[in-house]
Amino acid sequence: MTTREQPAADHWRDRVESHHDQSEAVQDASALDDDFWRPFASHFRLDPRRTDDPVLERLVRYIGPDQTVLDVGGGAGRFALPVALRCRRVTLVEPSEGMLDEARAGAGEAGIDNLTVVTGTWEEARVEPADVVLCSHVLYGVAEVVPFIRKLEAHARERVVVLKFINPPQSRLSPFWKAVHGEERIEMPAMPELLSVLWEMGIYPDVEMLEPREAHGYSSREEALDQLRRRLYVVPGTPEDGSLQTSIAELMVETPDGLEIKGALPGRQGVVSWWTR
């Protein structure tokens, strides 16, 4: 199949590249960390023995105690660590050293010794196949999504399991982008576009929708300002920073737990999975 015969994949690529181009146009290269995710990494680390995570409980239904799991883009081990407690072995592939530092620390604290971490992108990673390949909230920013998915398939002996939001996870920050940078944010593709790509590839997955998840808030104005500066590529003390601080006052509301974005709707996500055998 030629590129011209893949309109869904072409649309996906255009959206991702346009989003990245828009981001690069406002970035101050001198202010960027080589590891974008390092400042956020600790927020993605959770107790691997937690029992109050309905998403985790749904995911582990796809994994047996004697199976091996490959977690692609698994970050700080949010799912890799608890899954490792319930299966034979987990391999975690992740390009962010900041995220992997958190995963290693979490594994050490929990006494998990059946986790292998591989530093690098999925495109460049060389790993052995596993029974189940998990890919949680990774595909949004992948321009060449078809070969990425084909590689997931090639490494899954039994099943591919993808976790995806209906809307891109950062879409709730779009009003701040417009207030700061003066233009509408180009959104990355999400679950609807993924399904179109999969169907175009001849993959017809099962889709299981999960319960809505409450929108993430911030414990304080300082935390909100720090995280939004990083997410929106805003340098402190610039005119854009002034616009951001004004927009926080206008677009957020105080709650007993801190700050929340006005009108932010609960996130809807689903498990997209298919057999490969």
What are these regions (language model features)?
Residues 126-132:
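A short acidic, Gly/Pro-enriched loop at the edge of an enzyme's catalytic core
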